Amino acid sequence: MRILLIILCWALAWPVFSQKSKSRPDYEPLFGKSQASYKVTSSSLKGATFYLVSGHGGPDPGCIGRYQGKELHEDEYAYDIILRLGRELLMRGAKVHFIIQDAKDGIRNTSILKNSKRETCMGSPIPLNQIARLQQRCNKINQLHRKEKGIYKRAVFIHVDSRARRNQTDVYFYHAQGSTQGKAMARQLQRTFAAKYDRHQPNRGFDGTVSARNLFVLRNTTPVAVFMELGNIQNAQDQKRLVIPSNRQALARWIAEGIVKDYQRVKKK
């Protein structure tokens, strides 16, 4: 009789335990302590897989600009935005691989992101040699891609450009030569950004372009890929896009929303 009562109590309590476990947030330590916990709030990207790559890293800081007497390092801002983008994608139900990782940085809500050389390619030291560095991240993406199933697997590369200080540039998008799916994704991202600027800054316009480029990482990655340049790190206006944390978050959110639309396009086929 006592055993029956124990079983009955356990059966009655099980739905409560089950509900609690389902409501627990997911956890990604790369986001840092304050942002590591997140909840999946949508299934809009369920079944999609992403390989997220922030430019440069490790021994290579990428482009360097100056803002209020401080240095802005391309790799730090690209990495912060990649983390924010990854979190947005995970919250929409996607599977996300962060190819470049820094175990300490996390998502940072400061204007000046201090440079470090801690970044790795999923735990492996990043080579100084450019070709070796690029081949390393392509190899990692391709290895992961071969192991996974699904109709929508995308590599996203994020960089910051460096031009003459007077040249203000909008976000622009590259795809591999001959990649119809890469071009379609890039165009959807471009349309999303144009619509966002029309809404938030009427009459501003948006001049971000889409074009094919013969870049090493676009040539040598197996999944469909898009490569983004987020602005000119030397230009005062473009720097605001990078140094203001809410602007970095907006960039991540807009990219995620454009990706959702592209995923919906593919699923309709």
Q: Which residues fall in each region the model found?
A:
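Catalytic-site microenvironment of enzymes
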Residues: 2-269
